[in-house]
Amino acid sequence: MDLEKLKKDTQVIIDDVIKQTEIKAGQVFVLGLSSSEVNGGLIGHASSSEIGQVIVSVIHKTLSDKGIYLAVQACEHLNRALLIEEELAEKKDWEIVSVIPQLHAGGSGQVAAYQLFKSPVEVEHIVANAGLDIGDTSIGMHVKHVQIPVRPILRELGGAHVTALKSRPKLIGGERARYK
């Protein structure tokens, strides 16, 4: 795998997704990542620390520079828990759980984020404003309603399918209501 190309493609994708989702400083962005799929394998069967490190580093720096919080989803072995900064967990009053991610229990993305974050903690439930799914990891459970699919400018990263979600407030009130 060409890690320089992976880095450049990740940057193109995250810049495009930020633009399309219109996520703002102070909001939460969830990342689901299968380095196995990026590597051309089956999800959970060809994990790569290097791939996880490259992708998460690019996304973390880009979001941090804009004041956006990153939440990295774990694999199903950790019940899709999320690695976030402790500051965010305290701000949102999200319950912290105890586990340290490993390559095959949490995944390469969480391991990379654990090393990059200032004070990483795991939580089981969040409500993110938008997110990026690299490798069909099913991030929808973590994005608030109403979710709207976003098609990134690049639809594949390595061998992985790439999609994203943004959210909008629910439209309530029926035929008499007016909306922006």
Swiss-Prot record:
Pfam families named in the record: DUF436
Gene expressing this chain: yeiF
Lineage: Bacteria, Bacillati, Bacillota, Bacilli, Lactobacillales
This protein's name: UPF0340 protein LL0489
Similarity field: Belongs to the UPF0340 family.
Ranges in coiled-coil conformation: none
